[in-house]
Amino acid sequence: MATCNVRCHPLFAGALVLAAAWLALEPAQANLSNVIRIVLQKGRHYDPGDLYLRRGDTITLVNGDENAVHHAFIEADRFAFDAGDQEPGKQATLVLREAGDFVIQCGVHPKMKLTLHVQ
């Protein structure tokens, strides 16, 4: 009976390389759920205006206006957040621990809204 080795089956060797690469990437994929997103508050709007996120992600709200104060908050049945008054250049951080759709509003600028879609 002939023995099989990697030299006799180059496709098998390629499959082994791909499998090893996939296994090496698996821990990195597990950590992708903890992503930090930067949201700019400037000109009476949030940029971006919609975000699709996962539980455990963090968003940082940065006041990019030179003179305007912002006041980001969320009021939901099972989740609340209040950044307080944010002077120009200041930032507030929020860790998303609940799944669902949430709207961040600005207490100073009522039409300023950011929709969060958290899975």
Task: Label each residue range with its predicted role.
Residues A2-V6, W22-Q119:
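Extracytoplasmic copper-binding redox domains, predominantly the cupredoxin/blue-copper superfamily
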Residues A13-W22:
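Bacterial N-terminal signal peptides
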